[in-house]
Amino acid sequence: MTTEAKCPFNHAVVGTGTTNRDWWPKQLRVDLLSQHSSKSNPLDPSFNYADAFKHLDLQALKQDLHALMTDSQDWWPADFGHYGPLFVRMAWHSAGTYRIGDGRGGGGRGQQRFAPLNSWPDNVSLDKARRLLWPIKQKYGQAISWADLMILTGNVALESMGLKTFGFAGGREDTWEPDQDLYWGRETKWLGGDERYSRGSPGVDEAHGVLVKDDDSQVPHTRDLENPLAAVQMGLIYVNPEGPDGNPDPIASARDIRDTFARMAMNDEETVALIAGGHTFGKTHGAGPADYVGAEPEAGELESQGFGWHNRYGSGKGADTITSGLEVTWTTTPAQWSNDYFDHLFGFEWELSKSPAGAHQWVAKNADAIIPDAHDASRKHRPTMLTTDLALRFDPAYEAISRRFQQHPEQFADAFARAWFKLTHRDMGPRARYLGADVPAEELVWQDPVPAVDHALVDAQDAAALKQTILASGLSVAHLVSTAWASASTFRGSDKRGGANGARIRLAPQKEWQANQPEQLAKVLATLERIQADFNAAQSGGKKISLADLVVLAGNAAVEHAAQAAGHQVTVPFAPGRTDASQEQTDVESFAVLEPVADGFRNFAKRRYAVPAEALLIDKAQLLTLTAPELTVLVGGLRVLGANVGDSKHGVFTSRPGVLSNDFFANLLDMRTEWKATSEAKEVFEGRDRSTGELRWTGTRVDLVFGSNSILRAVAEVYASADAQEKFVHDFVAAWTKVMQLDRFDLA
């Protein structure tokens, strides 16, 4: 027998071979609800990052980072003798993947360490930045996460180059594997944009920099960027620096910039400040053709040890570096904060040129060589700019802001510091999550602030009395449950926004959302506000209950009442301490993105979408940080409690609505029922008695998926079993409480 024949794996290893996804590419991604489990986390179960960070010597760490900025290493020498610009780019590209549409992306979980981000064409050379940081990360260990360290290093870099930053907050916990829920687009080639736009760049077969072939740029992409994406091409953080699809058109580039930055929650002033501030520092790298650059880290060899983009041009580093394919240095002070950027932008006329790598860029006409070389003090260069820089001059709105910043450097510095803080903290959620001595005192509207608790809180006896009053008010179980759910389920685990705290369900825009049934909502809130006013007026010692707390307590009361009707005595946990935000504390435009276009928990969809309803349900559950069992038990419970929008009977598989029973599962899995679609759209289905043809139930895709999908059916079978009624009630209460408290970071 040969050695090859003896091998038990026959060249195959665990996890390879044809997968379920290969056979059924449209299979529902229930697995997204089990990512980032404790099984991938090497830290002890008792480890608490917030506690560890509180014991961190933050000032000592910052001193070490300051020292690193000018400690140039031979294996990756610092441009201009200062690593600051490289670390600013690292932090920017960590935070800059955030998009407001679904709150995903950003720097909050240290995902730049993993694929695909660690190998994106736009992140060339950031593997070197993280390796430069490793000795410091190694020194401080788990007291500082990679997620926090990358952002903090960007802050320290700015400070070391003369900018007064707005502040820094820690609190970003690392994850230990790539995010699977993030939708980066459907393109299969780097730098492609032909799926996210109805017409866009087809991308390139091999792209180790952001350079796009000129023949791809003759027909710029359309303006219909797919939601929730913010980047214009696969593998870019924002926009193509050469212009749309490599077309060097500053006006067209401005349109891309405005769309992309708006999708990151930035207005025009913040956009100008960020671009100009970032480009005050450092340079781009395009010393030679991109053909000299090797494979990205994820495609690298073992001996590369996670390094990618091996450069065979010259020394492969320093003056020979190839990153983007562009070769631009914007200012005479590339390692020092200044107003040079605007002085150059408006002080010169610009002509189109090519970098040594062949990328479109702009050079100042008839200008002297005044720009320092990054590695040779005896050399100077003419000023250069990117197409995206000229957009700030030739777009009228951007130009007005840029000229104001040129005339008022103090406004520019403040605007950049604030925009940088927003960029690097936008995905952290409320200030209650902020840690450290450098947290700024100023409260900002984009942080979705809520007032501090300034009164005594209700106790268990008060809560019990209030629940009795609520149940006697004439409000139905269905209305109480649906209102509490509408308030709490706006939460997004992606950027920690939304939730019941603040009672913003009574404010614009939430009070007008279709899913919240404005007319019904107004009646429920009016009744609860009367109960709140009566209770608060009767108290002494300053005790009060907020409407935010009362909405949740009312939902709890309804759940307890429904459980009692099913024969189970339960007390739903309740933690007072929510407060009521004002309309002035609520950015209507910012909150508009939280509106549910579909909520399968309430059997709601604003319209029919290309994405199947059951996939939107998984997306909603993932944003709510739910597991597959939690998703299942909540849908089953909410159906029998009557929480559907518009009092729809779809999925209400029970003869006793308002009773917290497992009827949804028992009846869905009843083999006496045969299901058929009511139309070719297959959105609504009828369940008829197999023998008589009598109509028994109607349901939607988000109902029938619990009998169709093998994973969800396995869970549904547990709750449909004869011995599951008590377990169902207790599991529903636990999952309900989790959702009601998702935004209660103060409880941690």
Swiss-Prot record:
<keyword id="KW-0560">Oxidoreductase</keyword>
<dbReference type="InterPro" id="IPR002016">
    <property type="entry name" value="Haem_peroxidase"/>
</dbReference>
<keyword id="KW-0349">Heme</keyword>
<keyword id="KW-0479">Metal-binding</keyword>
<dbReference type="InterPro" id="IPR019793">
    <property type="entry name" value="Peroxidases_heam-ligand_BS"/>
</dbReference>
<dbReference type="InterPro" id="IPR019794">
    <property type="entry name" value="Peroxidases_AS"/>
</dbReference>
<dbReference type="InterPro" id="IPR000763">
    <property type="entry name" value="Catalase_peroxidase"/>
</dbReference>
<feature type="cross-link" description="Tryptophyl-tyrosyl-methioninium (Trp-Tyr) (with M-264)">
    <location>
        <begin position="92"/>
        <end position="238"/>
    </location>
</feature>
<comment type="subunit">
    <text>Homodimer or homotetramer.</text>
</comment>
<dbReference type="GO" id="GO:0046872">
    <property type="term" value="F:metal ion binding"/>
</dbReference>
<keyword id="KW-0376">Hydrogen peroxide</keyword>
<comment type="function">
    <text>Bifunctional enzyme with both catalase and broad-spectrum peroxidase activity.</text>
</comment>
<keyword id="KW-0408">Iron</keyword>
<dbReference type="InterPro" id="IPR010255">
    <property type="entry name" value="Haem_peroxidase_sf"/>
</dbReference>
<protein>
    <recommendedName>
        <fullName>Catalase-peroxidase</fullName>
        <ecNumber>1.11.1.21</ecNumber>
    </recommendedName>
</protein>
<keyword id="KW-0575">Peroxidase</keyword>
<dbReference type="GO" id="GO:0020037">
    <property type="term" value="F:heme binding"/>
</dbReference>
<feature type="site" description="Transition state stabilizer">
    <location>
        <position position="89"/>
    </location>
</feature>
<dbReference type="GO" id="GO:0042744">
    <property type="term" value="P:hydrogen peroxide catabolic process"/>
</dbReference>
<dbReference type="GO" id="GO:0005829">
    <property type="term" value="C:cytosol"/>
</dbReference>
<feature type="active site" description="Proton acceptor">
    <location>
        <position position="93"/>
    </location>
</feature>
<dbReference type="GO" id="GO:0004096">
    <property type="term" value="F:catalase activity"/>
</dbReference>
<feature type="cross-link" description="Tryptophyl-tyrosyl-methioninium (Tyr-Met) (with W-92)">
    <location>
        <begin position="238"/>
        <end position="264"/>
    </location>
</feature>
<comment type="similarity">
    <text>Belongs to the peroxidase family. Peroxidase/catalase subfamily.</text>
</comment>
<dbReference type="Pfam" id="PF00141">
    <property type="entry name" value="peroxidase"/>
</dbReference>
<dbReference type="GO" id="GO:0070301">
    <property type="term" value="P:cellular response to hydrogen peroxide"/>
</dbReference>
<feature type="binding site" description="axial binding residue">
    <location>
        <position position="279"/>
    </location>
    <ligand>
        <name>heme b</name>
    </ligand>
</feature>
